[in-house]
Structures are given as C-alpha cells and as structure tokens.
Amino acid sequence: MAKGQSLQDPFLNALRRERVPVSIYLVNGIKLQGQVESFDQFVILLKNTVSQMVYKHAISTVVPSRPVSHHSNTPSGSTNNYHGSNPSAPQQPQQDSDDAE
C-alpha cells in the first residue's frame, strides 16, 4: 500500500501547502470544490464555506485549478507527506522531461 501512496501523498501535500483550489469528482458524478485542508490514508478534508470529510474510496478524480509541482525529493517509503508534518527542506521546482516522441 505504501507504493500506491507514493504518488498521491506528494500530490495532495502540494495542493494543501500551496492552497490550490481543486475540483474533486466523486464516483457518483458529484463535483466538490474547495481547498485541501488536510488528508490521511483514508480521507481528504476539503474546505470551502464549510469543511467536508471526503472518503478517498468515493473519489474518482482530483483536478487542480492550476499546475502544481508535486515531485517528492524524499526517499521512497517516507511518511513525511501527511498533514501536520513540516517539510525538512524547501522544495525545489523540477521540470518534467518531454523527450518521448
């Protein structure tokens, strides 16, 4: 399970840290909008006019309103991406390589 979260944790943490507005689409088609306030292994706390606890198993898609840099510079298996932890070092922007043709 740690392997699956190695993508979602840095992504959600970047959304939370940068306060990026997001649209979250649920599997039943409902669209929720707000900012990621916090998250854990099972839920995302989405804040708009109220805070909503959204279970991850009900989420189909998370769409940020703008691009975010979510590459993790931490070794795999690290659990430093959960809400409440402080990054140990400032994140440096990285560029995706588009060498594939």
Curated annotation (Swiss-Prot):
The keyword Oxidoreductase does not apply. Residues 9-68 form the Sm domain. One of its GO terms (cellular component) is cytosol. Residues 63-101 are annotated as: Disordered. Keywords: RNA-binding, Stress response. One of its GO terms (biological process) is regulation of DNA-templated transcription. One of its GO terms (molecular function) is RNA binding. Pfam families: Hfq (PF17209). The keyword Protein transport does not apply. Belongs to the Hfq family. This is RNA-binding protein Hfq. It comes from Yersinia pestis. The gene is hfq.
